[in-house]
Each structure stands twice: as structure tokens, then as C-alpha cells.
Amino acid sequence: MAQAAREILQATITEWMKFAAERDKMRKIANDVAMVTRTIIKDHLTFFKTKQIDVECENSEDLKVLGTKISVDPIVEETFPTVKASVALKCGGASRFIIINVNATISAGGPPFMFEELKKGVPETFINNAAEFVRDAFLNVARTGGVTTK
């Protein structure tokens, strides 16, 4: 194989490896952010439950408000050479997105913060954003019975 051809192919492989590493990193971050978010929402629903509101929050994977499922899903869009990540929060017409930027900062209703900061302790703005989502989900389900309009 000619040296020039080898260099072309090696550059392609290097670019792919960089993309694959970024994709794996963003998948991990998105999954971790979703897990933290589910735990926070579970805590908020537990508070609702103490006030006799119809919620299900026995575990972080099965969350419901007034019988309507709350979904917290990591989303990773992988279109070579770009990787975008977010976490989608949805319930009965209410939705929010937590954006994970390429530099591992997280935007979730307030000033962006580093993912490493989330691992040390959850910022108050992140907790408040989750509370606003739970409120919106509750109010939307209460108004519509959980039926979303298109």
C-alpha cells in the first residue's frame, strides 16, 4: 500500500476513533444525568405523596403522577462526526430537556455547570428545574387527564 493511501486511511480511522470516544463519553454522561434526574423527581413525588396526591414513586424507574407515567430518557444523537446529548423529561404534555454540551457542561434551567460538579453535589438550580417539571406535569395531567394534544 502506498504511503499516501495509508495516511489517508489512518486519518479516517483516527477521526472515527475520536467520534466513537466522544459518543461513548456522551452516552455515559446522558445516562448518569438521567439517573440523577429520576432520583430527584422521585424525591419530589415522595413529597407529593405525603400530601395525599396520587403519585407512584416506589422506585426511580417507575414514576407516575395521577396515573400518568413520567419518562426521563437519555437521548444521544450520533451523526458522524457530531454527537449531541440531552435528557428528555415528559409527562402528560409537559416536557423539558436537559442539554449536555460537548464540553460536558449541563444546561438545565439556570447557569450551565460542569458534569463533574453534578457528581459532587446537585446544584439547587437543577433541583428547582426538576421541581418545576413535576409541577408542570401535575398541572397538565390534572387539566387534561394525561391526554396530550397534537
Identify the role of each PLM range:
Residues 95-150:
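Ampiphathic alpha-helical segments that act as solvent-exposed interaction surfaces
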Residues 2, 82-85, 91, 127-128, ...:
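Short, intrinsically disordered, low-complexity terminal segments
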